[in-house]
Amino acid sequence: MPSVVPQERQQVTRKHYPNYKVIVLNDDFNTFQHVAACLMKYIPNMTSDRAWELTNQVHYEGQAIVWVGPQEQAELYHEQLLRAGLTMAPLEPE
């Protein structure tokens, strides 16, 4: 009688990629209007009210997380805000 050898099951583990934080830093040369306008221009679904809240947070707390999400999109928004003249922290995983 042939013996049956159970086959090992392979575990499939899904790797979750981290989200990245786009952080704007306070500086002495960008105006409130410029920061808020850049946030509305480059960050998807950014409302005027939210842009101004974040701009105030940048000013009074020194920084604000303006967007969190997948690395590729975070890199794009980070680069766009940087090119617009905003002072940016390096991207960091959440």
UniProtKB/Swiss-Prot annotation:
Involved in the modulation of the specificity of the ClpAP-mediated ATP-dependent protein degradation. Transmembrane segments: none annotated. It holds the Pfam family ClpS. It comes from the Bacteria. This is ATP-dependent Clp protease adapter protein ClpS. GO terms for biological process: protein catabolic process; proteolysis. The lineage of its organism: Bacteria, Bacillati, Cyanobacteriota, Cyanophyceae, Acaryochloridales. Belongs to the ClpS family. Binds to the N-terminal domain of the chaperone ClpA. SUPFAM superfamilies: ClpS-like. NCBIfam families: PRK13019.1-3 (NF009563).
